[in-house]
């Protein structure tokens, strides 16, 4: 036919025509070779990249979508060209109407169904404020107007289809026929008409089930009434309000009263102006009834069978057509009506769209009450009972169905993989294509069956308001996963499927053309001429021409219409016609394979059943073995997104999407991610603390889940992001461990161990906290001690030699200790500036303590006793070899006790001893701060190679002429290095500072009463020794209250106070410790002598008493010796070898030397207050 359009200049003779064909074949071979080379080149690139791009596509990434559906660029007029002009017109009209119906159906399914269904979604009752309902409806009115126009158009198309069919099927009595229609049945037309009627009744069902829409509509009308009473208040002109109200009434009557379908079938189909008569056209009535029965026969055979494709949807159309037939012709075929209702036993309910379920029996009884009366009530009741039993049986058989489909789908996937991975051989090419075609169709059939089970079961439960068991929910979710698995399978092998589909369609077209060719030859060979035979031949030629091309929807439609004409007069034998019909059905399926699979695997309905999602997640969590199935479920949840984009009641559909996104993520966090985080954390904690035996960890006794499987999952795609379970849990653990470590730094080792365990057990790559580490023992922070120094010095005891503080008493099972490492780590945390601040805080503390010290020394009872003792010592020192008598110290102790005792049994001297110990503890703490600072500095400076010769980085940078930023960085580095070097080399003389700041005040004439201090030291040491022995005895008796083994704070306090008063010489002049030693040695010898005398008499009790006395004396002597050593050590810190006068002399000499070295320059100013500011 195409040759007719060429100009005469391009006519070739037969020789040229043959040469052209040869040349075309050569070019085709060259092109084929080029493509093969190009393919192999691409394959080599893929191999080099080690990433087979084309083999398997990742459903989650989907960077490129491959659309297989061919697009028809020729118009219907161009496609339908035969010599038979009348036939051309008939086929063109019907094809155009069918195309129109398909477009209307597509528009309804994508735009109008979704717009109506999602109305009112995205806003919870709690977030809705008054007036939101009316605002939503206000936005939605324009959508309803569009829907009204759409429905009107549908009415027009239905009317036109009926008129076009009625015009064709007329009896000879009325007038001449356009074409001979005996044996011609345009079944395709009725199927399309059924589809359009299905659209209308679906719209009715959506509106009928939409309570929110009706409620909002009522509220909106009320709002309009209130506006109507006072339009000026709302800034609306009254003349505009009335037409708008009329328009709303029209919309309500047309769309919201459930009359969309009814109004369509109640149209006036007979032309009033004497045109086409429909209701009285008996030929058309018979043809109409025959077509419905034919379609029904095909549908009934396949309904509920494994090979069912779209029979349910056609059944809805048949019901619509039957009601339309009854409405037009007012005749009922009782037998057929009963057959239609009998289907309800096979199919109790049909899902029209999303969550809209349709009951055929209700529809037929409601739309045809006259026919319903002919049936007995029992049979109608039986249908309803059967629906209930169907649901019960389905609930029981769901698990079996899941297992069966698991096996079916798994074996189908294996077939797909093996078949598509095989290289195609040329000798079995046709057989391979047939196999592939069958496997593809089988996959689609499984998808259809699974989809039907899920939708019917879920929607029936919802419609009948019956609760679903958890078992049923889990089974249905498994089916959803299987459904998505089928879609994923097709998608993964998109490249091979795309390649196969084009070959299969060509193969099927070839088979169809062969069948048509045989029939065409049969018609041509028959020499009898008739117009009917000419129509048949023209129809077959049209079918042939149309099949020679891409398998587009329009071409397949034309072939279907052409064969409706071409199969009359027995042009095909029975054994030829059935295979042709099968081939055409396969061609339909394969040509739209991707679209049909997508439609069946579309889980948009899940939005209305998202209440099952928490139960599903709980199941996934409990059965972590199948964790990977989460991908399928999220793929199903993602299917709701395109539909939501058609919502029109909110400002933007993005609001609805955000709301849905948040809801799903909240459920995921609550039912899976947070539970997983807590479980992993708990497992790590219990594993690290197994030594505590917190609970039974035996996996044979206590069931354990392998949660590690969750971390091997690829990130799950949802909306425009990926949910990475591994990253989520890792972040949670990192955050938790970091926060808990900052609260309790001493636990850093435990959390570090937990991090390592998380890596080993779950493969989680954790981040190091990089917090300053501490030693494993618990250590108080410098800042904490500094702020509470008054509590610290009273609760902790100082050990001079080990330079350690030990807690005095604690309710815990262990005592806290503080050593140089703790202090060094704290200084590293807070910086060296904390040292100076600590000294200042200690200075403030000492000021308060020395005030109490001064008050005690000034007390009349104390002062008078001390003056007496000084006078007494001066008088007897020559007689007593310049030694302070031990008896005098004991007498002083006893005398003080007479002054009074506290409720705790302490004398004033005991309290004074505690004061001195606290002062000494404060000084011990200052010493530890200095040592900790040196420790910290030496740790920081240890990587500097030579402390004596540190290069200047600033100079080096200047020499190289580097940038200003680098110079600044070098200057900072030099500064840091010099600070650390100075700190590590010398440190700061804090003791000297604290002596210098208090000494002048202590030595002033107004504080003359403090000069008596040296004489109170002997009784004070005696008090201390008695207290110390008492504490150590408690330690031996395991009495933790008041037990102690060290308290060098006392020695430090005495040494510091003597230094401040410059009384080392005065104290030494007492020769106190020498006096003590002589006294105890003398007593020990006396006891030993007595023991020798008594050993002859056999009095054992007396001997035991003497032994105990000797031990006691030795213990006392040992304690005094220890105190003497501690005091001697402490005195070294305060330079006990020099008096205040000698120190001043030394200071002056240094100053003179400095002046001499500086020349006679201006005197440098010295700070009056040596305490660090």
UniProtKB/Swiss-Prot annotation:
Q: Which organism is it from?
A: Mus musculus (Mouse)
Main localization, broad class: other
Its keywords, alphabetically, are: Acetylation, Coiled coil, Endosome, Phosphoprotein, Protein transport, Transport
Provide the positions where the record notes the PTM N-acetylalanine: 2
User: Where in the sequence is Phosphothreonine found?
Assistant: 1154
Family statement drawn from the similarity comment of this UniProt entry = Belongs to the SWIP family.
- Positions of the UniProt region annotated as Disordered: 1141-1173
Phosphoserine PTM positions read 7
Q: Which GO terms describe its cellular component?
A: BLOC-1 complex; early endosome membrane; endosome; nucleoplasm; WASH complex
Keyword Chaperone in annotation: no
Q: Give GO terms for biological process.
A: cognition; endolysosomal toll-like receptor signaling pathway; endosomal transport; endosome organization; neuromuscular process; protein transport; regulation of Arp2/3 complex-mediated actin nucleation; regulation of protein complex stability
Q: What is this protein called?
A: WASH complex subunit 4
């Amino acid at each position: 036919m195409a040759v007719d359009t060429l100009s005469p200049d391009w006519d070739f003779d037969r020789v040229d025509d043959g040469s052209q064909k040869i040349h075309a074949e050569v070019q085709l071979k060259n092109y084929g070779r080029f493509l093969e080379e190009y393919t192999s080149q691409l394959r080599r690139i893929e191999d080099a990249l080690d990433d087979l791009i084309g083999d398997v596509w990742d459903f989650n990434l989907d960077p490129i979508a491959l659309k297989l559906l061919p697009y028809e660029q020729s118009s219907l007029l161009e496609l339908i060209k035969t010599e038979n002009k009348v036939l051309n017109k008939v086929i063109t009209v019907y094809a155009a109407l069918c195309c129109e119906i398909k477009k209307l159906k597509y528009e309804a399914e994508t735009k109008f169904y979704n717009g109506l269904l999602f109305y009112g979604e995205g806003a919870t009752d709690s977030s809705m404020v008054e007036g939101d309902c009316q605002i939503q409806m206000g936005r939605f009115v324009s959508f309803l107007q569009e829907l009204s126009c759409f429905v009107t158009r549908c009415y027009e198309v239905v009317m036109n289809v009926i008129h076009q069919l009625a015009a064709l099927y007329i009896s000879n009595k009325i007038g001449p026929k356009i074409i001979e229609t005996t044996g011609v049945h345009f079944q395709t037309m009725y199927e399309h008409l059924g589809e359009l009627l299905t659209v209308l009744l679906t719209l009715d069902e959506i509106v009928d089930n939409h309570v929110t829409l009706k409620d909002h509509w009522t509220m909106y009308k009320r709002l309009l009434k209130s506006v109507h009473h006072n339009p000026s208040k709302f800034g609306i002109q009254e003349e505009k309000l009335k037409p708008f109200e009329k328009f709303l009434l029209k919309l309500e009557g047309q769309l919201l009263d459930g009359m969309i379908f009814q109004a369509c079938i109640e149209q006036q189909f007979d032309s009033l102006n004497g045109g086409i008569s429909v209701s009285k056209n008996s030929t058309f009535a018979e043809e109409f009834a025959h077509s419905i029965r034919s379609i029904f026969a095909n549908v009934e055979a396949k309904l509920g069978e494994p090979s069912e494709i779209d029979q349910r949807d056609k059944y809805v159309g048949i019901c619509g057509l039957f009601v339309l037939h009854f409405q037009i012709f007012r005749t009922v075929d009782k037998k057929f009506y009963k057959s239609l209702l009998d289907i309800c036993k096979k199919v109790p309910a049909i899902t029209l769209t999303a969550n809209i379920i349709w009951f055929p029996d209700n529809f037929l009884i409601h739309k045809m009450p006259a026919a319903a009366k002919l049936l007995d009530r029992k049979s109608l009741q039986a249908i309803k009972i059967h629906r209930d039993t169907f649901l019960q049986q389905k609930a029981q058989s769901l698990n079996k169905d899941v297992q069966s489909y698991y096996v079916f789908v798994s074996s189908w996937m294996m077939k797909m993989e093996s078949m598509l991975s095989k290289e195609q051989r040329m000798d079995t090419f046709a057989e391979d294509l047939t196999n592939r075609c069958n496997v593809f169709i089988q996959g689609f059939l499984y998808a259809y069956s699974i989809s039907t089970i899920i939708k019917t079961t879920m929607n029936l439960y919802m419609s009948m308001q019956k609760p679903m068991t958890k078992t049923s929910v889990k089974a249905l979710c498994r089916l959803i996963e299987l459904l998505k698995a089928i879609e994923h399978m097709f998608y993964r092998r998109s490249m091979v499927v795309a390649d196969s589909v084009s070959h299969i369609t060509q193969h099927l077209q070839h088979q169809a053309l062969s069948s048509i060719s045989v029939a065409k030859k049969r018609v041509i060979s028959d020499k009898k001429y008739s117009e009917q035979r000419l129509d048949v031949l023209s129809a077959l030629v049209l079918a042939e021409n149309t099949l020679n091309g891409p398998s587009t929807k329009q071409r397949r439609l034309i072939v279907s219409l052409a064969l409706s004409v071409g199969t009359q007069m027995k042009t095909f034998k029975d054994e030829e016609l059935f295979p042709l019909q099968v081939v055409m059905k396969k061609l339909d399926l394969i040509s739209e394979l991707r679209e049909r699979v997508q439609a069946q695997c579309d889980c948009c309905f899940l939005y209305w059943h998202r209440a099952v999602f928490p139960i599903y997640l709980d199941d996934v969590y409990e059965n972590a073995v199948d964790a990977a199935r989460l991908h399928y479920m999220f793929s199903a949840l993602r299917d709701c997104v395109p539909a939501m984009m058609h919502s029109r009641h909110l400002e933007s559909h993005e609001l609805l999407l955000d709301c849905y996104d948040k809801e799903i993520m909240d459920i995921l966090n609550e039912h899976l991610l947070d539970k997983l985080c807590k479980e992993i954390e708990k497992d790590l904690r219990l594993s690290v603390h197994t030594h505590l035996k917190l609970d039974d960890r035996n996996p044979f006794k206590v069931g354990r889940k392998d949660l590690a499987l969750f971390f091997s999952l690829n990130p799950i795609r949802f909306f425009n992001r990926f949910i990475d379970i591994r990253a989520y849990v890792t972040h949670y653990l990192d955050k938790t461990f970091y926060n808990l470590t900052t609260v309790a730094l001493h636990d850093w080792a435990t959390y570090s161990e937990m991090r390592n365990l998380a890596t080993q057990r779950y493969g989680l790559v954790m981040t190091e906290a990089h917090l300053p580490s501490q030693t494993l023992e618990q250590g108080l922070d410098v800042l904490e001690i500094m702020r509470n120094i008054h509590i610290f010095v009273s609760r902790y005891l100082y050990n001079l030699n080990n330079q350690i503080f030990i807690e005095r008493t604690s309710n815990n099972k262990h005592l806290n200790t503080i050593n140089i490492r703790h202090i060094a780590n704290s200084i590293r945390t807070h910086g060296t500036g904390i040292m100076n601040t600590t000294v200042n805080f200690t200075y403030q503390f000492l000021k308060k303590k020395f005030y109490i010290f001064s008050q005690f020394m000034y007390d009349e009872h104390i002062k008078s006793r001390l003056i007496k003792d000084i006078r007494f010592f001066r008088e007897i020192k020559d007689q007593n070899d310049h030694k302070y008598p031990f008896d005098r110290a004991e007498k002083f102790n006893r005398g003080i006790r007479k002054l009074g005792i506290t409720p705790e049994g302490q004398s004033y001297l005991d309290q004074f001893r505690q004061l001195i110990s606290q002062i000494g503890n404060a000084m011990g703490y200052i010493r530890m701060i200095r040592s900790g600072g040196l420790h910290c500095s030496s740790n920081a400076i240890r990587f500097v190679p030579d402390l004596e010769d540190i290069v200047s980085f600033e100079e080096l940078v200047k020499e190289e002429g580097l940038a200003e930023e680098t110079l600044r960085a070098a200057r900072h580095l030099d500064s840091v290095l010099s600070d650390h070097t100075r700190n590590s080399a010398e440190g700061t003389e804090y003791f000297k500072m604290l002596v210098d700041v208090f000494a002048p005040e202590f030595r002033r004439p107004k504080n003359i009463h403090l000069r008596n201090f040296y004489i109170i030291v002997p009784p004070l040491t005696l008090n201390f020794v008695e207290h110390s022995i008492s504490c150590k005895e408690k330690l031996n008796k395991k009495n933790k209250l008041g037990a102690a083994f060290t308290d060098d704070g006392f020695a430090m306090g005495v040494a510091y106070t003597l230094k401040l008063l410059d009384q080392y010489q005065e104290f030494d002049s007492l020769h106190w410790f020498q006096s003590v030693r002589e006294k105890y040695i003398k007593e020990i010898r006396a006891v030993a002598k007595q023991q020798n005398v008594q050993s002859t008499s056999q009095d054992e009790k007396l001997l035991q008493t003497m032994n105990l006395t000797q031990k006691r004396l030795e213990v006392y002597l040992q304690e005094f010796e220890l105190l003497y050593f501690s005091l001697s050590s402490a005195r070294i810190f305060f330079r006990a070898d020099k008096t205040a006068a000698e120190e001043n002399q030394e200071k002056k000499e240094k100053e003179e030397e400095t002046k001499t070295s500086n020349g006679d320059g201006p005197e440098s100013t010295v700070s009056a207050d040596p305490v660090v500011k």
